[in-house]
């Protein structure tokens, strides 16, 4: 069974830890259909980091409206059949997206 999963990562001033989160998604044994980072008004270079180091990742930038707004913005942009949310300071084990 193939699942189309959109991964949504809200982020606010987390450029120092965001790579760990993104790398854990990219290392999934069952890859995500899309990865969306919603930058919630960061001033620490989050946008530049994602654009430079993660060209496969969709980046959505908004004014700081909080994590719930960032998640909702990611949902609006997503195209997957399933949604998976990851906080920008967290990471997944490689089997997280495997259908069970």
Listing of model-derived features with the role each one plays in the protein:
Residues 1-100:
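Nucleotide-sugar donor-binding/catalytic module of glycosyltransferases
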């Amino acid at each position: 069974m193939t699942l189309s999963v959109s991964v949504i990562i809200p982020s606010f001033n987390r450029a120092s830890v965001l790579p760990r989160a993104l790398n854990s998604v990219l290392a999934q044994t069952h890859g995500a259909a899309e990865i969306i980072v919603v930058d919630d008004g960061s001033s620490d270079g989050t946008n530049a980091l994602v654009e430079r180091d993660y060209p496969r990742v969709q980046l959505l930038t908004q004014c700081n409206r909080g994590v719930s707004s960032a998640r909702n913005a990611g949902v609006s942009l997503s195209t997957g059949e399933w949604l998976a949310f990851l906080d920008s300071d967290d990471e997944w084990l490689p089997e997280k997206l495997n259908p069970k």
